Regions:
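Extracellular/secretory-pathway and virion-surface proteins
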Residues: 181-555
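Bacterial Sec-dependent N-terminal signal peptides
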Residues: 1-25
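Sterically constrained small-residue positions within well-ordered secondary structures
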Residues: 11, 16-18, 35, 112-114, ...
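Conserved catalytic-core segments centered on acid/base and nucleophilic motifs
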Residues: 15, 111-113, 119-123, 427, ...
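Extended soluble regions of mature proteins
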Residues: 22-199
């Protein structure tokens, strides 16, 4: 990428305006016959030398960043795109070929638009049918997009018979009114780099981990920015979340590869609430047994898994499962199998926004493994301004998380479901909670023939003693991810281990949470109980269930 000044463009542009008559065409957008008044109108400045495509918001200096201005140079039909990423940051790219490659079916149909006789041309773009109405009366070429630049002056474009952009006025102008916008230095880049920079400028990225190792080794050490626990199986970093406004969506995105471990492993991305006297961070620093213990009567104590008056468990953002050996074991060859090189995991976590907004919190990743090479992971959290507003809750309270994140530091497996009591949590609401939901994530484990990993089991959820939800968490799509699992073992029946259906998880995938409606909950004490008919042990083999729950709602 190199830098050039915009001065030459401005000089040439102003020269063009002075030497050739310029027309300003204003367009309106409509969808299914309804004018889209919430969108700025497209403006095209056309003369014999070049076209410039902007909109009313840009011309009036009211556009939000990022925004684009497109110029079509004539007679070469070179498309020059300018992206204004933020104040003082402009990039551009040039395309000399796209206009010339356009093909159209020219039809005999005609109609009048603004008094001009228009002809119809039809083309297809990415399976979309585009109808273009253009006039040759003005002896000009241009339009509201790069489509049809060679046909004439495009006055109407219709896509798939429902989306329409139509010219509302055509007038001669002396002053284009955009000179003050095009100021400063411009960085030129290739088309792919341009698209990437423009795309990434549309959202905020919190880069948390970049190719960090998660392994099992006594040599794993913390540094100034990243803490490591449980022999390197947990990595942790403090993250400052910006204030998240209504209408902003938040995603977590993790990329993982094997760095030596060939097996499918349980993984989780989590955040540590610090709203009470004790937190999960205390357990990491001082040992799991310093955290509150849960006792269901089976003789074991499960530390740090349930909320108490003085303790909040780790809040799970995303449950994921590593594939069998992706990346490090791609040398294993099978005919017709072209292995993927990285496992991507991405999940919308907007419902957790109330517990993140404006706070500085520890964010961690755990992968349960006993391999010195282990895994490499990169983690980003992205924030997007969006018209989609599915989650309207302003409360997110972690109630339980039985996934033993500190497994390699002595935290026991979640085998509490071998008793009828299962998991039982008492919590207190200080205010009424409307439209309450339980964000419930569950996966069954026990990797032998009769283990709960491979045996469907009913999960039942009770609120204040009443069953509100019951289902069998079961994934039957695991075979879809075979190409992420090069080290998966193959059986005599023609199946591979990664093909097998499991209790709500597959190697190489995310496990989605269930959103269980609870209605309105009054202020005061409540209980939540999870019951699962956990299978019995066989020798040294046992089953366990990793369940996490976050209470959502509006206060």
């Amino acid at each position: 990428m190199h830098t050039r000044t915009v001065f030459s463009f401005l000089t040439f542009f102003l020269f063009c305006l002075a030497s050739a008559q310029t027309y300003e065409i204003r367009y309106t957008n409509s969808y299914n016959g309804k004018v889209q008044t919430d969108q700025p109108s497209t403006i095209v400045l056309v003369n014999k030398n070049e076209n410039v495509i902007v909109n009313t918001a840009i011309k009036e200096h009211k556009s939000t960043y990022p925004f684009e201005i497109t110029k079509v140079e004539k007679p070469s039909n070179t498309v020059v795109s300018y992206a204004f990423l933020k104040p003082g940051k402009i990039i551009s790219t040039s395309d000399r070929e796209s206009v010339g490659k356009q093909t159209f079916e020219l039809t005999p149909e005609t109609k009048k638009i603004l008094g001009y006789t228009c002809k119809k041309a039809v083309t297809k773009v990415n399976s979309n049918t585009i109808e273009i109405w253009y006039t040759q009366d003005l002896k000009l070429q241009g339009g509201p997009s790069v489509l049809g630049q060679n046909l004439g002056l495009v006055l109407e474009v219709e896509r798939n018979k429902n989306s329409l952009i139509t010219a509302q006025s055509v007038q001669k102008v002396r002053d284009a009114g955009i000179e003050s916008i095009l100021k400063g230095d411009i960085q030129t880049t290739d088309p792919l780099g341009y698209k990437d920079l423009l795309w990434k400028s549309r959202f905020t990225t919190l880069s948390i981990f970049d190719r960090e190792t998660i392994n099992f080794s006594d040599a794993s050490q913390s540094n100034d920015s990243i803490k490591r626990y449980a022999n390197g199986t947990i990595i942790l970093k403090k993250v400052k979340f910006p204030t998240l406004a209504e209408g902003e969506n938040i995603f977590t995105e993790l990329r993982q590869q094997s760095n030596g471990d060939a097996y499918d492993r349980t993984g989780t991305v989590f955040v540590i609430p610090q709203d009470k006297e004790k937190s999960f961070f205390d357990g990491l620093e001082k040992g799991a047994k310093t955290l509150p213990a849960y006792d269901n009567g089976n003789g074991k104590h499960y530390y740090g898994v349930v909320s108490t008056e003085n303790y909040s468990p780790a809040m799970e953002m995303m449950r994921f499962f590593t594939a069998f050996g992706i990346g490090n074991f791609n040398h294993i060859q099978l005919k017709g199998k072209n292995w993927q090189t990285i496992s991507p995991y991405r999940q919308d976590i907007t419902e957790l926004k109330p517990s993140l907004s404006g706070k500085e919190l520890w964010v961690g990743v755990f992968i349960g493994n006993y391999d010195k090479g282990g895994h490499t992971v990169s983690l980003d959290i992205t924030i997007h301004k969006s018209d989609q507003n599915v989650y309207k809750n302003n409360v997110a309270i972690p109630l339980f998380n039985t996934l033993n994140i500190m497994e390699m530091a002595g935290q026991d497996y979640s085998t509490m479901f071998n008793k009828d009591k299962g998991l039982w949590v008492e919590f207190t609401l200080k205010k009424d909670l409307k439209n309450a939901q339980l964000r419930y994530t569950t996966t069954g484990h026990g990797g032998w023939e009769n283990g709960d990993e491979f045996v469907p089991k009913t999960n039942s959820v009770f609120i204040d003693g009443n069953m509100v939800f019951s289902f069998i968490p079961w994934r039957t799509d695991c075979g879809s991810y075979r190409l992420y699992n090069p080290a998966s073992g193959n059986f005599q029946d023609g199946l591979s281990s990664s093909d097998l259906s499991r209790s709500n998880w597959c190697p190489g995938t995310v496990t989605n949470p269930n959103f269980i409606s609870l209605g309105d909950l009054k202020a005061g004490k409540h209980t939540v109980q999870i019951k699962i008919p956990q299978g019995p042990t066989e020798g040294t083999s046992f089953s366990a269930w990793n369940v996490s729950g976050v209470l959502l709602g509006v206060q």
